[in-house]
Amino acid sequence: MRFSVVETFHGHRGRLGNICGLRIGTGEQCLDTPTCLLYTQAGSAPHLTRDMLHKLGDVENLPALFPLPPITSFVDSVMQFGKGLGSFVALQSHPSFIRIQDPMVTTPSGFNDKAGVSVWDQGGRVHLNPLSFTRMMEAFQPTCYQALCDSDTPQDASRKRLQRAVDRSVSLLDQCLAMKADSSCLQHSAILGSVQGGYNRDFREISAKETAKRDVDGFVIEGFHVNGPQTKSLKFEEVAEILEEVIALLPQDKPRFLHGVLRPEFILKAVLYGIDIFDASLAHAATEAGCALVFNCSSDKDLELMLGRDLLDQELEMDMKNARHREDFVPLLESCACYACTNFTRAYIHHLLNTGEMLGQVLLSLHNIHHFLGFLKSIRKFMVQHGAKELNGN
């Protein structure tokens, strides 16, 4: 996996970039950044078949995020299958990225130790050490995976907990790197190191410097939250200063990831601070809540508004279970060209959700993913246009 910076911008660490060498099967793909990873659960985009997913157009080759917890239960089957995770779940056209925890599920606290990290699948707790984890990765053969790390650092974490998270994450990374180097199955898989330290600048600096010394292909900024839909309440201003300091310590020639159910204004500001890749879990969180994403993001003026203030909840999403939509015979979003908006009304989707019909969540998923991907496309366009203005001194 090779990352190159296409353009940087005066006054910001934000950049347009390109990732090449993303291995899928015997071929390779490239990816423009900033962007996001398609969110999956148990190997599929929730509520959507592959054919329905690909009706979204630009999504066909979008890299997919596979949270580790819901896929640990079928690792033996994937191993016997012998062709890797992407082919096993019929998403072989999507580069596969494996993350240790699920951004949609709150991570229980207090279950990591110096030997390894705990995740939770349908059967309960699974404790992973570097050896068992590497064997899983050999079965899954991902395009890219996050090394084991201890990200159990809620906002009220003690200095002792932060110290352990930093020390353990570096130790686990070293072990994962050594085992990857000895594995013939993982020679073409990229590996990501994680920057820990919670909200403590000293620990963040130690973690960033130590992780940057390792031979990793990119960096995941971890430890600002413990995952789950409640992450949406995190304000960018709470992490801005620490994030800026961390980014300054990381090399320019490697991508930076930040995962979680993050609001659009958080994502936009994080891009300007130098984050390259997010995930689309916000779209899934909205669907699970019975909501349609409706925030305006198609114009420069819309994005400038996000930089100036936080969106109101009613500006972000619309509750489609609300009775006021019973006779609302317009699309979810008038300007949207997705399958749901071009064929169905708010009234019908409201009816589907309130009668428990699966089609309701299918249509919401199609709309929310389409809208979220359009948002990332608007950010790239915004950066191109405003970068040119800044570089020209206008």
Curated annotation (Swiss-Prot):
Entry similarity comment: Belongs to the queuine tRNA-ribosyltransferase family. QTRT2 subfamily.
One GO BP annotation of this record: tRNA-guanine transglycosylation
Assigned keywords, A-Z: Cytoplasm, Metal-binding, tRNA processing, Zinc
Cell compartments where the protein resides: Cytoplasm
Function comment: Non-catalytic subunit of the queuine tRNA-ribosyltransferase (TGT) that catalyzes the base-exchange of a guanine (G) residue with queuine (Q) at position 34 (anticodon wobble position) in tRNAs with GU(N) anticodons (tRNA-Asp, -Asn, -His and -Tyr), resulting in the hypermodified nucleoside queuosine (7-(((4,5-cis-dihydroxy-2-cyclopenten-1-yl)amino)methyl)-7-deazaguanosine).
Name of the protein in its database record: Queuine tRNA-ribosyltransferase accessory subunit 2
Cofactor(s) the protein needs: Zn(2+)
Tree of life domain: Eukaryota
GO cellular component, one term: cytoplasm
